[in-house]
Amino acid sequence: MKLRRILRAARPFLGVIALLGAWWVLAASQLFDPVLLPSPWKALLALIDGFANQNLLYDFEVTIWRTTASLAIGCLIAIPLGIILGSNEDIYRSLEFVVDFFRSTPTSAMFPLFLVLFGVGDKTKIAVAAFGASLVILFNVAYGVMNSRKTRVLAARVMGASKVRVLFDVYAWESLPQIFVGMRNGVSVSLVIVIVAEMFIGSSDGLGRRLIDAQMSFDMPAMYATIFAAGALGYTLNWIFLSIEKKFVHWGGK
């Protein structure tokens, strides 16, 4: 029984151990050039060194700031708009093509437009990431409102609630689980777009810029360390929103 409990507790780490083990075997066998595939230990040392000398830490913080800012802007735009669109089918149907069109357009294809509008700098990176995140959040919020319980809406109207009260006291709460789903998806989209923008839109800092610099200089341990940092950041942000969702909308679907 004790062994079974230990195995159950270790289960989430088995995939990580298997991945590191496979990486170690490939690096030790030298099937690939050791310069291109260093050992996990070298990548770990590069990660520790990057945080110790604060170079990687600074880029990490810059990417967090850009991701957080873009997500906040996306939420401020998409959540109220999604509630309004979802509560009025006529308005939603009239704008459905526009929303789906831009949602289906690769955000990277919008880089030139945002560069023209905002120039080279943080504004462009944050704006293009906010654009991508807002579309994901908007779709989820509108979907949550459209699938809200009709009985609660009718009950509010019978009791004399105005359209505004129904909008914010019924639809907003009914769509809250989908709002959090949209925010979780939105923060992932924001992070991806921010890192890609840092790589290709004239940036001097951030994890994306650090990745490109390491790749161009063939500093493979630093490149893998930055990939680890970006992956850890994405996982942590998703975990934070999932934890908040479980705490505050545990009643979802009940």
Regions found by a protein language model. Give the residues of each.
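Loop-to-helix entry region at the N-terminal start of transmembrane alpha-helices
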Residues: 58-66, 116-137, 180, 222-226
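C-terminal transmembrane helix and the adjacent membrane-cytosol boundary/short C-terminal tail
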Residues: 89, 146, 177, 181-184, ...
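Cytoplasmic-entry segments and transmembrane alpha-helices of multi-pass inner-membrane transporters
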Residues: 80-115, 129, 139-143, 148, ...
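Transmembrane alpha-helical segments of polytopic membrane transport and secretion proteins
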Residues: 1-17, 239-254
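Short cytoplasmic-facing helical segments at TM-TM junctions of multi-pass membrane proteins
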Residues: 143-179, 211
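Non-cytoplasmic
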Residues: 30, 129, 182-232
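Periplasmic/extracellular loop-to-transmembrane helix junction in inner-membrane transport proteins
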Residues: 3-5, 29-72
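Transmembrane alpha-helices
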Residues: 127, 131, 164-196, 237
